[in-house]
Amino acid sequence: MSRDFAALRGSQQGPVLLLASGPSAGELCLDAWRDVPVITMNGAIAKLANSAIEPLFYVCSDLSFALQQPELYALGLERARHLALWPEAIEGLSERLRGKAHTLRRAPSTRLEHYLGVEREQAQRARALLSRRARDIGFSRDMDYGIFDVRTVAYIALQLAYHLGFTEIYLAGVDLNAQAQRFYEGGTGPRSPCGLDEHLHNRILPGFKVMQDVMTTEGRQVFNLSRSSRIPAQLIPRADLAVVEGAWLGLRTRQAG
């Protein structure tokens, strides 16, 4: 039987790495992150295949991914401590895997009362009363209330990181470049479809703006480790990957000494 997310709400603190599959994720030095919780998604689990890192969560929001990349999907299911999947995906799991699966569900469609504060504890929405396309853009504070999907799985992972309680969030591989291969895709291997260009300006970036408003108001920080990301640095500040990884390695050395 799958679970809800309530028992894990606020269970974490401090830093977390959100590992996506943009090509910049290939630059990560995993040894630097071995003491930092990791939330990974879709095919980005490939980065951890030859490491000892056990991700806290594996998030897969693409119901076709299991057919497109069955080996990577199976790896994510096995390696992660927890899974965040749609109900249809959970139905296809073994009883053992269902025991660590948490059910993704969509937040309620926007109604006028949502702009009047009735869901203040659960979510924040973009103020777009006159735009049908942007009306259901928001950021969930409670995974069991439901998530907002702006057409990139990294955004679901951000809502999960918030729900869990993390306050220092690092984005790796969130390049949002539809023309670039994912770091795990070879030149002749199968490629999963990508609709980033279609949704970047009308859903993805407006969603990240709502997310950043929530995080900033509550004193949480989000950093982008990708130098080639299409998310403007004014929206999510860049962090120098070498500096961040050097800090983690230095901290471990001091603690060991």
Where are these regions (language model features)?
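Metal-ion/cofactor- or nucleotide/acyl-coenzyme-handling active-site neighborhoods
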Residues: 1-257
